[in-house]
């Protein structure tokens, strides 16, 4: 009779490796040509151990084969310029993504070029794979920060880690989905759905993004498997509820003026429910009431968030997805 859905996203801001990526500088250094993926603070990528991961496709006479690739080592660094050569570095220095953000891969004495190195990664992950050394390769590879997450603070009350936006919510949603399997009663008439989209950071307009028919197609196929016709599927959609699970901004200790005057969430004070008059988030009075009631009944603390009226803020995937699958305000009948 309906779906209970959590929607999160798997991607984070990064740098995508371009085709033909190798750049030789001064006949000595080999850097990689990359482009920005998503919105980021570029300076946070400097002087950190980085690597690449993603998908590679090998083309051979026997066909096309896909591989997941992770160069599991400290492979790259985007080097900063020393203060002695850039005295204004602390005075709002801007970074050019085509000039300043090229990761250093090695020098001209490197054993493998980048393409050969990726092929060796494919081979090392599974010794039983057919050799791809002589095959043509196409790739979708992204840089990632190799540093591990850390719990810190006087009372270990904070966590810092790469890609919390939005792996944190994707993981929590998946764990909740699995845990709920043990508590579903016989008269439960909903289908629980954990949906993790891709490409939220670049607008969601891809076949695996929120601005696609991916979710609605899957939900309709589930309804067909239950023997429902189109009308009953639409009725099920109208009786569904979706939580868009993404991160929120806490009040910044050094920039408290950047937060809204009355909606000011703090770290470790509970789940954040986000509002936006320009419809960048999914919350309205009905969905808020439902979620608030759930939290109150389970003694789950929650807070509210809104942007300052003179700061645009970000957006997320929920409003995009809801506009396509037409989940209405379902539990008026609850």
Language model: regions and residue ranges:
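Soluble metallo-hydrolase cores and metallopeptidase-like ectodomains found primarily
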Residues: 1, 69-160
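A generic, well-ordered mixed alpha/beta core segment in the N-terminal half of proteins
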Residues: 2-88
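Beta-strand segments within the central parallel beta-sheet cores of soluble alpha/beta enzyme folds
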Residues: 5, 187-199, 234-237, 241-243, ...
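Alpha-helical metal-binding/catalytic segments enriched in His/Glu/Asp
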Residues: 8-10, 30-32, 37, 160-203, ...
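Acidic, glycine-rich active-site loops and adjacent beta-strand->loop/helix elements
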Residues: 10-13, 21, 38-40, 60, ...
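Metal-dependent peptidase/peptidase-like ectodomains
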Residues: 86-115, 203-298
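Short glycine-rich, acidic/polar surface loops and turns
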Residues: 285-292, 309-324
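Conserved small/polar residues in nucleotide/adenosyl-binding loops
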Residues: 325-329
């Amino acid at each position: 009779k309906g779906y209970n859905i959590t929607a999160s996203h798997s991607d984070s801001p990064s740098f995508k490796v371009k085709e033909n990526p190798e750049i030789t500088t001064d006949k000595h250094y080999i850097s990689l040509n990359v482009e920005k993926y998503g919105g980021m603070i570029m300076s946070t990528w400097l002087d950190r151990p980085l690597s690449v991961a993603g998908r590679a496709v090998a083309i051979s006479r026997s066909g096309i084969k896909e591989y997941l690739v992770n160069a599991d080592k400290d492979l790259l660094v985007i080097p900063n310029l020393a203060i002695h050569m850039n005295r204004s570095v602390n005075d709002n220095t801007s970074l050019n993504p085509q000039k300043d953000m090229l990761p250093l891969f090695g020098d001209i004495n490197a054993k493998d070029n980048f393409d050969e190195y990726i092929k060796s990664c494919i081979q090392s992950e599974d010794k039983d794979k057919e050799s791809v050394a002589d095959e043509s390769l196409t790739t979708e590879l992204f840089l990632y920060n190799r540093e591990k997450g850390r719990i810190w603070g006087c009372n270990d009350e904070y966590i810092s880690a790469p890609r919390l936006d939005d792996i944190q919510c994707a993981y929590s949603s998946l764990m909740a989905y699995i845990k709920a399997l043990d508590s579903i009663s016989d008269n439960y008439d909903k289908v629980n759905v954990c949906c993790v989209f891709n490409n939220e950071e670049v607008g969601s307009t891809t076949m695996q993004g929120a601005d696609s028919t991916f979710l609605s197609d899957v939900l309709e196929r589930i309804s067909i498997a239950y023997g429902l016709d189109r009308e009953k599927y639409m009725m099920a959609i109208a009786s569904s509820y979706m939580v868009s699970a993404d991160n929120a901004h806490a009040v910044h200790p050094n920039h408290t003026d950047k937060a809204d005057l009355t909606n000011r969430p703090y770290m470790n004070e509970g789940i954040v429910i986000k509002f936006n008059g320009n419809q960048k988030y999914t919350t309205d009075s009905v969905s808020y009431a439902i979620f608030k009631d759930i939290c109150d009944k389970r003694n789950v603390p929650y807070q509210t968030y809104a942007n300052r009226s003179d700061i645009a803020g970000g957006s997320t995937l929920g409003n995009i997805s809801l506009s396509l699958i037409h989940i209405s305000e379902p539990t008026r009948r609850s």
